[in-house]
Amino acid sequence: MFAEPETWVAIAFVILMGVFAYVGVHRTVLTTLDRRSARIKGELDDARRLKDEAAKLLADYRARHASAEREAQDIIASAKAEAERIAAEAKVKMEDFVARRTKSAEGKIASAEAQAIADVRAAAADAAVAAAAAILSQSVKGQVADDLLANGVNEVRAKLN
C-alpha cells in the first residue's frame, strides 16, 4: 500500500489540504471569489442600467422622429393648401382682370361705334343741308328763299344731330 504512488499522492493531497486549511487559504480563495462575484454583479448592474438608458434614448429618439415626421407632414399640407389658395386667388384675379379688360374694350368699341354713327349722321346732315340749300337756292329767289333756307337748315341740323 505505501509502495503505491497513488497512496503517496493521496497523502500529499490530504496534507496539502490540511496546510491550506490551517493557513486559511480557503478564506482567501472565497474572499477573492466573492470580490470577483461582486465586481461581475456590479458590471452586470451597470450593463443593465446602460441597456435601460439606451432603451429610453431609443424610445425618445423614435418619439421625436415621429413628431418630426408629423410636423413635416403638417408643414407640407399647409404649404399645399397655401399654394392652392394662392392659385385660386390668382385665378380669380386673372378672371376679374380679363372681365374688366373685356368690359373696357367693349365700352371703347361702343363709344367708337357711337362716335362713328354720330360722325356719319353729321356728315349726312351736312350733305343734306348743302343739297337742300342748293336746291332751294335754285328754285326760290329773294328774301323768302333766304328765310326758308335758314329755317330749313336749322331744322334739318336739329333733327339729324
Curated annotation (Swiss-Prot):
Keywords: ATP synthesis, Cell inner membrane, Cell membrane, CF(0), Hydrogen ion transport, Ion transport, Membrane, Transmembrane, Transmembrane helix, Transport
Coiled coil: none
Recorded name of the encoding gene: atpF1
Alphabetical list of InterPro entries matching this protein: ATP_synth_b/b'su_bac/chlpt, ATP_synthase_B_chain
Family matches, as Pfam families: ATP-synt_B
Sequence intervals crossing the membrane: 5-25
GO CC terms in record: plasma membrane; proton-transporting ATP synthase complex
Quaternary context: F-type ATPases have 2 components, F(1) - the catalytic core - and F(0) - the membrane proton channel. F(1) has five subunits: alpha(3), beta(3), gamma(1), delta(1), epsilon(1). F(0) has three main subunits: a(1), b(2) and c(10-14). The alpha and beta chains form an alternating ring which encloses part of the gamma chain. F(1) is attached to F(0) by a central stalk formed by the gamma and epsilon chains, while a peripheral stalk is formed by the delta and b chains.
Membrane topology reported for the UniProt record: Single-pass membrane protein
Originating species: Nitrobacter hamburgensis (strain DSM 10229 / NCIMB 13809 / X14)
GO molecular function annotations of the record: proton-transporting ATP synthase activity, rotational mechanism; proton-transporting ATPase activity, rotational mechanism
Family according to the record: Belongs to the ATPase B chain family.
Biological role stated in the UniProt entry: F(1)F(0) ATP synthase produces ATP from ADP in the presence of a proton or sodium gradient. F-type ATPases consist of two structural domains, F(1) containing the extramembraneous catalytic core and F(0) containing the membrane proton channel, linked together by a central stalk and a peripheral stalk. During catalysis, ATP synthesis in the catalytic domain of F(1) is coupled via a rotary mechanism of the central stalk subunits to proton translocation.
Lineage: Bacteria, Pseudomonadati, Pseudomonadota, Alphaproteobacteria, Hyphomicrobiales
Keyword Hydrolase on entry: no
UniProt-recorded name of the protein: ATP synthase subunit b 1
PANTHER family per record: ATP SYNTHASE SUBUNIT B, ATP SYNTHASE SUBUNIT B', CHLOROPLASTIC
Subcellular location: Cell inner membrane
HAMAP family associated with the record: ATP_synth_b_bprime
Main location: membrane
Top-level taxon in the UniProt lineage: Bacteria
